[in-house]
Structures are given as structure tokens and as C-alpha cells.
Amino acid sequence: MKNTSALAETAALWAAVRFTADGLVPVIAQQHDSGEVLMMAWMNREALEETLVTGKACYWSRSRGRLWRKGESSGQTQKVLALRLDCDGDTILLLVDQTGVACHTGRRSCFFNEVGPTGEITVVSAPLVTPEALYGAEGHSHP
């Protein structure tokens, strides 16, 4: 990622990104070297600008109603190596270098519940670290 404010002001980018009516766009974070899908989150324009300028993933927390700088409380950061738009401009793919785990449950990926053919759900990966170790004794609520 280029760390320039000029990039965040690129008119072509703002014309290409199709935000929802409430000003958000879904974002998928994927580990750049393995292709592992780590998580899904949301960005508003401010979060996207900050991500472009800093090269670090910044999202919009719908539950908290504020910017969520990935790793600000856990230390589990995402360095953004590339940002891609899908064909419709309504979803962003971040290729990241994930430090530690991506999920607030302590798992590498948020996608650890596998749904079987009859609808049963099986947990396919165990936590690598406890939420308490990441966020302290008070734990962590969903971003």
C-alpha cells in the first residue's frame, strides 16, 4: 500500500466503491501468502481512507458506532499489502499480513463453523489463544 494522502483522495476510487445506503462496504481480509480467508468486516469512507493512508486495516464497528483499528486492543494487527474491489465495486478484498489471530474468539480465522449437509454445525478449529489473553480479564465483545 502507498502511504500517501493523495491516494485516499483519488476520485476514481470514490467513484468505484459502491457503499450501502448507510455508508458501508463489506470487506474480506485474506492472508496474502496462503489465501486463507481471515474475517469479514465493514468499512465506511473514513475507515477506507485511514487504511489507504496508514497501510493498516481499519474498519467500522457497527456495534460500537466508531472506527475499529484492527489490533488496537489485542495487538493482532493486519498490514495491508493490497486492496482489491470486486467487479461491482460493492465488496473490498484486503490482502493482509496478519499478526497473530484474526478472530476475537482467539482463532486464526473467523470462519471456524462448518455447516454439514443436514445443517449441523461443527467447529473445525480450536482457539490458539484465549480472549482473556488478548483483551484482558474483561474479555471482548464482538466488534
Curated annotation (Swiss-Prot):
Keywords: Amino-acid biosynthesis, Cytoplasm, Histidine biosynthesis, Hydrolase, Magnesium, Metal-binding, Zinc. This is Phosphoribosyl-AMP cyclohydrolase. It comes from Rhodospirillum rubrum (strain ATCC 11170 / ATH 1.1.1 / DSM 467 / LMG 4362 / NCIMB 8255 / S1). InterPro entries: PRA-CH, PRib_AMP_CycHydrolase_dom, PRib_AMP_CycHydrolase_sf. One of its GO terms (biological process) is L-histidine biosynthetic process. It comes from the Bacteria. Its cofactor is Mg(2+); Zn(2+). Zn(2+) binds at C87, C103, C110. Its EC number is 3.5.4.19. Binds 1 Mg(2+) ion per subunit. Binds 1 zinc ion per subunit. It is found in: Cytoplasm. GO terms for cellular component: cytoplasm. One of its GO terms (molecular function) is phosphoribosyl-AMP cyclohydrolase activity. Disulfide bonds: none annotated. It catalyses: 1-(5-phospho-beta-D-ribosyl)-5'-AMP + H2O = 1-(5-phospho-beta-D-ribosyl)-5-[(5-phospho-beta-D-ribosylamino)methylideneamino]imidazole-4-carboxamide. Belongs to the PRA-CH family. Mg(2+) binds at D86, D88, D90. Catalyzes the hydrolysis of the adenine ring of phosphoribosyl-AMP. Homodimer.
